[in-house]
Amino acid sequence: MSLNILGKVAGILALTVGLAGCMDVTMEIDVQTETTGKATTTSVMGADVYAMIKAGAGSDDAGDDGFCKEAGATLTENADGSATCLLVVEGPFAELNDADAKDDGAKFEVVSPGVVKVSFTTEDMKGELGTEGQDEETKAMMQQFFEGHSITIRIKGKEILDTNMTKNGNSAEIVIPFLDLINGTVELPPALYATVKVN
């Protein structure tokens, strides 16, 4: 699990296109103390696409298809034919970011006793996902795959004190349509953040 959320969106899109389908992705950071948290990534692949992936793999073992292959991930096949991949990592903030995240991972800063600011840059998200250089057929295919699907980024704590995302009870989140990323029309501040109370 990585909190290198925005930097990894390009990878998510590349994987999704490679699977000839689309999914909805929710990435959540639950700040539990001044030094620890829980990161949860939930990816849902629609029934039609998941059926194609399984058929393409030549077996009922979805693990062969590349979807939900990350260490520690749990795959659930839903009654409607869709599939949900859940990955949870809990522990010190340093363990929530990939070792290779470098400057693109989530930043955790204790701003006062019991108050933590979580932030991450949006530059990678805005810079890597345009369709420049692609032919019209490829652009049309990507539009079809990703229409109606989105990535949700959520930060939780005991209380949200300040944020530039949408506040919803004890969480702050932003929902970004994949098409806005692909078309380069997404409007984001230089960084997304939420300041949360943890006690």
Residue ranges with predicted function:
Residues 15, 60-62, 78:
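Residue-level signal for mature regions of secreted extracellular proteins and peptides
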Residues 70, 74-199:
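Mature, soluble, non-transmembrane domains
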Residues 27-29, 35, 153:
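Buried hydrophobic packing residues in well-ordered domains
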Residues 23-25:
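Bacterial signal peptide processing site
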Residues 31-47:
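Post-signal peptide N-terminal segment of mature Sec-exported envelope proteins
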Residues 1-10:
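Bacterial N-terminal signal peptides that target proteins for export
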Residues 44-74:
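Post-signal-peptide N-terminal segment of Sec-exported extracytoplasmic proteins
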Residues 18-21:
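C-terminal motif of bacterial Sec signal peptides marking the signal peptidase cleavage site
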